[in-house]
């Protein structure tokens, strides 16, 4: 059953649909109130005029679907699948900053508090995010002073002979030394910290008051005084929060600017009626979000809000967005259930709130100009900045970048792409079939391709590039460096860019990784070169697999050996051309018996399909 036939059989229920390419890879995930209607809309006249949607339709060979009970379930499932599968044609959130959380290590006998920007499934409890960032550190300092739960990295699985300075100055209970505290006392302190971080001030005050009274009854007046002071501190903090809340509710406000197939989004975080921080998001590949008439703003903001807020630890009571979108009420319900309180997503049309959205949109335009106009400087300036950032001995007039591609060690290939004087120089691209490596060994594969490339350069007395760039981490970088040294090339500028973290390692300074600002044109150009090497390697690898698969199919035909297979592929170019060829065309390449066998094979295949 072909794709069009399959779409006509889709149910009219709500659900999620998944487009797949020839390799079975999920390339787009979408949600729908009516699966048949939504998926069918891709194929109406004019739908593929948009280059992005057209690319999706040209690559998609299959569609799968998951039926759910309602729109709310479809929205949640779509978000989970996008985060899990990261489909190429969906917009994927790439934030330019991460906010700190406070981590309470409940998996330890003696839990501690830390400020962290990474959320892990390690049994710890996380509170936040906090912005501005220094607020998290101020809260932890308050915990040290009032609850005496530490942030140290001492091994608490064993006792030590003496406590550190923090215990002596009254900022730690001293669980590292036997006898200074016990599990009951420490457990009460941790419970207090949890109540404090969860904002349960009444429960915390009640617990502290009970302990204060008990201490007073036991004639422990110094301890009772400590509890009294702590109760006063908790009341003061609670009062300040109530005043801030009265001055203005917590809210997030969105604005955007769309131009030339690119979008800048600004998000203002308002807490207590004041703007405490802002975030920028930039999108250059909008995929299915960009319809023929421009940006599908409703679907864009629906997806954006899902990726920002679903599964987040904190969602403000009100979110203001500039446009209406279809599943706004469903998203409100999900977020309200997630936070155990009512969450509103509003689309103001007039008044102060609309003026606020317009203000955020003006900031988004400035961010757009800064990112897409100002920060795309002239080539010479860019090369100079790149030279300074990586501390290169000369201007990087030519960069050669390598990437390895395989699936579980099969059909391993490599690519080399070239950036020269501000442009990708496709005429100098090279493809390599890895010959000496068996199985999965990216390091050995990198050594082979670098050796082959630059051994030839040396033999032909050609100049080396200004920079050799490797797609990978420190391991791949060392493999490339070892290959160059083995053929007598020293002092060659060499760097690598690690995936996901986008950290740059320079050979000889691996212990000083370079973290470049996300808005920097230097990072953009390195990412562009790296992504092009990856694309080129993936494309070559797919073609190799297709050739292998075609070869296997032809070799299954009785009487067709390797020589006949090679002649057929060389003459017709593709399996599809062979499949549609007539007897006369086939007999120009193979004998009559072989031609008849080929015709019979594809005739039987067609009968099976129908």
Swiss-Prot record:
Name of this chain's protein: UvrABC system protein C
Domain of life of the source: Bacteria
Biological role stated in the UniProt entry: The UvrABC repair system catalyzes the recognition and processing of DNA lesions. UvrC both incises the 5' and 3' sides of the lesion. The N-terminal half is responsible for the 3' incision and the C-terminal half is responsible for the 5' incision.
Predominant location: cytoplasm
Family membership noted in the UniProt record: Belongs to the UvrC family.
Pfam families, sorted: GIY-YIG, HHH_5, UVR, UvrC_RNaseH, UvrC_RNaseH_dom
Sorted UniProt keywords: Cytoplasm, DNA damage, DNA excision, DNA repair, Excision nuclease, SOS response
Alphabetized PANTHER family for the sequence: UVRABC SYSTEM PROTEIN C, UVRC/OXIDOREDUCTASE
Gene Ontology biological-process annotations: nucleotide-excision repair; SOS response
Compartment(s) of residence: Cytoplasm
Originating organism: Koribacter versatilis (strain Ellin345)
SUPFAM superfamilies cross-referenced by the UniProt entry: C-terminal UvrC-binding domain of UvrB (SSF46600), GIY-YIG endonuclease (SSF82771), RuvA domain 2-like (SSF47781)
Stretches assigned to the UVR domain: 202-237
GO molecular function: DNA binding; excinuclease ABC activity
GO CC annotations on file: cytoplasm; excinuclease repair complex
InterPro entries: GIY-YIG_endonuc, GIY-YIG_endonuc_sf, GIY-YIG_UvrC_Cho, RuvA_2-like, UVR_dom, UVR_dom_sf, UvrABC_protein_C, UvrC
Subunit structure: Interacts with UvrB in an incision complex.
Residue ranges occupied by any GIY-YIG domain in the UniProt entry: 12-91
């Amino acid at each position: 059953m072909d794709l069009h036939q399959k779409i006509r059989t889709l149910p009219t229920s709500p659900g999620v649909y998944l487009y797949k390419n020839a390799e079975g890879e999920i390339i787009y995930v979408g949600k729908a109130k009516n699966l048949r209607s939504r998926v069918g809309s891709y194929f109406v006249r004019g739908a593929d005029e948009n280059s992005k949607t057209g690319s999706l339709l040209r690559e998609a060979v299959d569609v799968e679907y998951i039926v759910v009970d309602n729109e709310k379930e479809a929205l949640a499932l779509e978000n989970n699948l996008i985060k899990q599968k990261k489909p190429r044609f969906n917009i994927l959130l790439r934030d330019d900053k991460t906010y700190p959380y406070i981590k309470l290590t409940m998996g330890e006998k003696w839990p501690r508090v830390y400020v962290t920007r990474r959320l892990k499934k390690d049994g710890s409890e996380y509170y936040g995010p906090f912005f501005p960032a220094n607020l998290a550190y101020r809260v932890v300092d308050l915990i040290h002073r009032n609850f005496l739960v530490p942030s140290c990295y001492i091994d608490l699985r064993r006792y030590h002979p003496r406590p550190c300075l923090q215990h002596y100055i009254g900022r730690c209970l001293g669980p590292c030394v036997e006898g200074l505290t016990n599990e009951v006392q420490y457990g009460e302190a941790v419970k207090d910290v949890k109540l404090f971080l969860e904002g349960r001030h009444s429960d915390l005050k009640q617990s502290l008051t009970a302990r204060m009274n008990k201490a007073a009854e036991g004639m422990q007046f110094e301890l009772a005084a400590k509890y009294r002071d702590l109760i006063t501190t908790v009341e003061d903090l609670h009062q300040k929060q109530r005043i801030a809340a009265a001055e203005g509710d917590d809210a997030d406000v969105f604005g955007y600017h769309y131009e030339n197939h690119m979008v800048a989004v600004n998000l203002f975080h308002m807490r207590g009626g004041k703007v405490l921080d802002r975030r920028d998001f930039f999108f250059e590949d909008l995929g299915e979000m960009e319809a023929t008439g421009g940006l599908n703003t409703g679907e864009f903001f629906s997806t954006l809000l899902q990726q920002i807020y679903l599964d987040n630890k904190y969602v403000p009571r009100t979110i203001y967005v500039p446009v209406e979108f279809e599943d706004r009420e469903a998203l409100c319900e999900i977020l309200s259930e997630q936070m155990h309180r009512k969450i509103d997503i509003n689309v103001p049309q007039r008044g102060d709130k609309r003026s606020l959205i317009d203000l955020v949109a003006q900031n988004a335009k400035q961010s757009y100009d800064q990112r897409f106009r100002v920060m795309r400087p002239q080539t010479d300036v860019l090369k100079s900045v790149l030279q300074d950032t990586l501390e290169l001995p000369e201007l990087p007039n030519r960069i050669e970048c390598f990437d390895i591609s395989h699936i579980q060690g099969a059909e391993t290939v490599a690519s080399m792409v070239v950036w020269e004087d501000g442009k990708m120089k496709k005429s100098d691209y090279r493809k390599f079939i890895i010959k000496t490596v068996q199985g999965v060994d990216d390091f050995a594969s990198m050594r082979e391709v670098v050796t082959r490339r630059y051994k030839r350069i040396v033999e032909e007395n050609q100049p080396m590039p200004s920079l050799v760039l490797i797609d990978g981490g420190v391991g791949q970088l060392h493999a490339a460096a070892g290959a160059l040294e083995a053929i007598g090339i020293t002092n060659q500028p060499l760097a690598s860019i690690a995936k996901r973290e986008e950290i740059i390692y320079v050979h000889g300074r691996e212990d000083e990784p370079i973290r470049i600002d996300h808005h920097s044109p230097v990072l953009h150009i390195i990412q562009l070169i790296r992504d092009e090497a990856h694309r080129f390697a993936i494309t070559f690898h797919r073609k190799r697999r297709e050739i292998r698969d075609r070869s296997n199919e032809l070799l299954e035909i009785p009487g067709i050996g390797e020589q006949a297979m090679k002649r057929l592929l060389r003459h017709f170019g593709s399996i599809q051309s062979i499949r549609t060829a007539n007897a006369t065309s086939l007999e120009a390449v193979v004998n009559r018996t072989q031609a008849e066998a080929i015709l019979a094979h594809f005739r039987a295949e067609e009968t099976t399909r129908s």
